[in-house]
């Protein structure tokens, strides 16, 4: 089980995705780039939330085929959204950048680039 408490004091980039989602596939490399940079700086992680893929093998294959090294939880009904409060379950991909206290700093209701996310991370790192 993965919990935000595992990343206490770190920036966490949450990304809801599905292997069936074309924008999710296009942003996968960018998210891996963000994760690598966060790990290199020792300031955080990307955490994927696999939604609406009801075959866990398909989602695992997506992670492996794309060389994604960041942790990803399997949550087809997207129950995580309820815990986050106010996150639309119908918009995939959604990327939420959480500050070091795990408060939402930015929400992207679209596909992202590494620059989109790192611009936010760079500001949060200075806080």
What is the predicted function of each stretch?
Residues 20, 48-49, 107, 118:
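Second-shell loop/turn segments in exported
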Residues 15-21:
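Aromatic-flanked redox-active Cys/Sec active sites in thiol-based oxidoreductases
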Residues 13-14, 46:
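Hydrophobic beta-strand anchors of alpha/beta hydrolase catalytic cores
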Residues 25-66, 76-83:
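Structural microenvironment flanking redox-active thiols in thiol-disulfide oxidoreductases
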Residues 64-69, 75-126:
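Thiol/disulfide oxidoreductase modules built on the thioredoxin-like
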Residues 1-12:
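A short beta-strand-turn-helix
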Residues 10, 23-24, 52, 56, ...:
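Solvent-exposed, acidic/flexible segments
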């Amino acid at each position: 089980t993965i919990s935000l408490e595992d990343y206490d004091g770190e920036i966490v980039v949450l990304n809801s995705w599905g292997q069936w989602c074309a924008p999710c596939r296009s942003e996968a490399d960018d998210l891996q780039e963000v994760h690598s940079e966060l790990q290199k700086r020792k300031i955080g992680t990307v955490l994927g939330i696999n939604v609406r893929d009801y075959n866990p093998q398909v989602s695992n294959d997506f992670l492996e085929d794309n060389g994604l090294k960041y942790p990803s939880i399997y949550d087809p009904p997207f129950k995580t959204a309820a815990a986050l409060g106010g996150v639309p379950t119908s918009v995939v991909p959604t990327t939420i950048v959480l500050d070091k206290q795990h408060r939402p700093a930015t929400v992207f209701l679209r596909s992202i680039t590494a620059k989109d996310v790192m611009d936010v991370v760079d500001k949060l790192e200075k806080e």
